[in-house]
Amino acid sequence: MRIWRKSIQLQLITSMGAALLASILVVVIIFTVALNRLTDRYLVDTALPASIEAIRNDIERMLGQPLVAAADIAGNTLLRDWLAAGEDPAQAPQFIEYLTAAKQRNHAFTTLFASTETGHYYNENGLDRTLSRSNPKDKWFYGYIDSGAERFINIDIDGATGELALFIDYRVEKEGKLVGVAGMGLRMTELSKLIHDFSFGEHGKVFLVRNDGLIQVHPDAAFSGKRQLAEQLGADAAKGVMTGGESLRSSRFSRDGERYLALGLPLRDLNWTLVAEVPESEIYAQMHQAVWLTSLIGGAVALVSLLLVVLLARGLVRPIRRVTAALVQIGSGAGDLSHRLDDSRQDELGDLARGFNRFLDSQRSLIGEVLSTSERLRRAVEQVTQVVDNTAERSGRQQEMTEMVATAVHEMGLTVQDIARNAGDAAQASQSARDEALQAREVVQRSIRGIEGMSGDIGKAADAVSQLADEVASVDEVLAVIRSISEQTNLLALNAAIEAARAGEMGRGFAVVADEVRTLARRTQLSTDEVQQMIQRLKLGAGSAVSSMQAGQQATGSGVESSQRTGASLSAITDQVEHISDMNHQVATATEEQSAVTEEINRTVQGISDLARETAAEVQGCREECQALRGLADDLARQMGGFRL
């Protein structure tokens, strides 16, 4: 705390540096928050959902033709009648040929149909096997016919080839009675490639999940058909991405100490959900890099700015230190009044230097006058001393001749000396009073000039504040235009929202944009009202400032008048002091005349020895006083000589 109070430079550097660092820190924090929101809006709400929706569209487009083809097989009336009639072996080859043609036409892995009555399972190669409820491999068939579902899509291992395939099965009914199941199997190559090729960041994944939570297709083959979604994401996150209608669903979860974002998008009419998981560290990686880069740049800017602050503080403090050094040098005894500060600056430091130089000039002039006066005093004392010495010699010779009238001459001599001494003291006092009055008048004149300059500055400041009030008034017109624009924008956004509502599903996106525009317009209007209120307060403050400055200007005018009256009074006092000084000189002249008369009397009463002895004693005392006075004059000259002019 003591160091803080002793150094203005440290105060400037610390305060300005703290303000600079705080400003940069606020900017970095605002940038980080804004970038985080922008990342969420673009990547989480736009880019990633768009990628998932594109994959869903590709999957639905990939399965569209096979679904139609499988439905055609199940809807074949000849096949339906043949299964209902008991599967005549003579007609079996033509249906096998039909399955072969359907397989080739749709590039299927296999085509099939099975009878619910006999359990016979046919593919393009003929009768493959007989299904049984007791066989675990046939559980899919009986589970499907027992479910009553119109269509069954499943990923399973083909019994004939042992390869993983996507099976699409439809019910074959005749007159409302289930007679069989027909469909086809597709190779998983293209679908698996589509799932594996998904890339969002370095570790982003996408996989297909059945509505019961079983993962059907996963980039890691060990998860496909063997792992529940709840095991992969956690129960809460799995529930979040699997429920919620036909729109995109999102949830966040942690795994192995890392945060993930999970998104789920249902596949229309397929009872599957496309699920994607992406580490949050990869979503926000570029944002974190941008924040670090911004922080580094902000730190570099802060260091450079702090260096500039240090240089600026040193430049501001250097002239003050020069003034301090000069004052310390004068006060320590060096007395160098010839030193001057650089007053070329036009700012407050230049004013300080000019004022200090004027102070030194006035002190130099005053001390010069004192030196001149002390020299004259020393010469006068020497002359008086010489006169006293001569008088002592004459008084010795006159001692025997002045004995007869010693008493009378002694009384007269004392009286004359008292009058002379008093007259000299009065003359010296009046001269000192005159000098002090002249100095006081000069000080008052400088005060008048300073007050007049301050009055002019206050007038200029009042004009500047008035101009500021006029400029603030012009801002009201701009705010009125902004408010009008925001109201028109709000009206246009409302019309756009109405038109978008009329457009139905096609205008839903445009309605969202229109609603955002209306929200922005309302915020603009509220901000405009707040700015207008602030401007009104600013106008009131400017008016108060103008009134205060005008009152201050009037007060300084009164001060100028009072100072002028004081100067006039001091001038009158100076005149009176000069008159008193003239009267003292007349008294001194009269005293000198009386002293001459006394000398004549002394010459007349040379025989009176007592008066001569008294006169000799007084002359000796006067000699001693003159010696002491000469010593004081020498001391004064020596002390004043310590100043360098």
From Swiss-Prot:
Bilayer-spanning residue ranges: 15-35, 291-311
Protein keywords: Cell membrane, Chemotaxis, Membrane, Methylation, Transducer, Transmembrane, Transmembrane helix
Pfam family of the protein (one): dCache_1
Residues in HAMP domain copies: 314-368
Domain of life (superkingdom): Bacteria
Membrane-protein topology: Multi-pass membrane protein
Domain spans labelled Methyl-accepting transducer: 373-609
Cellular component GO terms held in the UniProt record: plasma membrane
All copies of domain Cache, residue ranges: 51-276
Phenotype when the gene is knocked out: Mutation abolishes chemotaxis toward xanthine, guanine and adenine.
Xref: SMART domains: HAMP, MA
Principal subcellular localisation of the protein: membrane
BP terms from Gene Ontology: chemotaxis; signal transduction
This protein's record includes keyword Cell membrane: yes
InterPro entries per UniProt: dCache_1 (IPR033479), HAMP_dom (IPR003660), MCPsignal_dom (IPR004089)
Family annotation (Gene3D superfamilies): Methyl-accepting chemotaxis protein (1.10.287.950), PAS domain (3.30.450.20)
Keyword Cytoplasm: no
Compartments where found: Cell membrane
Family (UniProt): Belongs to the methyl-accepting chemotaxis (MCP) protein family.
Task performed by this protein: Chemotactic-signal transducers respond to changes in the concentration of attractants and repellents in the environment, transduce a signal from the outside to the inside of the cell, and facilitate sensory adaptation through the variation of the level of methylation. McpH is a chemoreceptor that binds and responds exclusively to intermediates of the purine degradation pathway.
PANTHER family recorded: LYSOZYME-LIKE PROTEIN-RELATED, METHYL-ACCEPTING CHEMOTAXIS PROTEIN MCPB
Protein name in the entry: Methyl-accepting chemotaxis protein McpH
Gene: mcpH
